[in-house]
Amino acid sequence: MEIPLKEQESSLNSSSGHSSSTSEGVANTQGLDNRGEEILSQLYRPLKACSNTCYCKKCSYHCQLCFLKKGLGICYERSRKRSSKRAKTTTSSAPNESLSARTGDSQPTKKQKKEVETTRATDLGPGRSNTSTSRFAN
């Protein structure tokens, strides 16, 4: 049983000689891990405002915000609500008009019908004579 213990001790001694080279490798991987963590922390931190307005290739890729905005065309800003012209006119004229006028009651009354008929018969327009009645008279 002593033989396995001696083998373990000898293996430990031999591994201690290689420990300096492995510790350098571990340090290198830790350095890479630190750089990877730094890159990830930069990726997840909030984007800072950038005032660069140029859209050239160099400026589009110089920071993450510019890449998203200029390179990909993604913009997460709030869009302004545009009020339509119809909404403005209906709100301003609504208190002044009656309910039937707002609902679109388009049927004219009898007085309006008579006025329309008389204006059609009398007003023939410029340069026209009353030829329509002479055709039907024959």
From Swiss-Prot:
Record's keyword terms, sorted: Activator, AIDS, Host nucleus, Host-virus interaction, Phosphoprotein, RNA-binding, Transcription, Transcription regulation
Region Disordered, residue ranges: 1-33, 79-138
InterPro entries, A to Z: IV_Tat (IPR001831), Tat_dom_sf (IPR036963)
Keyword Transcription regulation applies: yes
Short motif Nuclear localization signal, and RNA-binding (TAR), span: 78-88
Biased composition range(s): Polar residues: 95-109, 128-138
Pfam families hit by this protein: Tat (PF00539)
Function per UniProt: Transcriptional activator that increases RNA Pol II processivity, thereby increasing the level of full-length viral transcripts. Recognizes a hairpin structure at the 5'-LTR of the nascent viral mRNAs referred to as the transactivation responsive RNA element (TAR) and recruits the cyclin T1-CDK9 complex (P-TEFb complex) that will in turn hyperphosphorylate the RNA polymerase II to allow efficient elongation. The CDK9 component of P-TEFb and other Tat-activated kinases hyperphosphorylate the C-terminus of RNA Pol II that becomes stabilized and much more processive. Extracellular circulating Tat can be endocytosed by surrounding uninfected cells via the binding to several surface receptors. Endosomal low pH allows Tat to cross the endosome membrane to enter the cytosol and eventually further translocate into the nucleus, thereby inducing severe cell dysfunctions ranging from cell activation to cell death. Through.
Name of the protein described by the UniProt record: Protein Tat
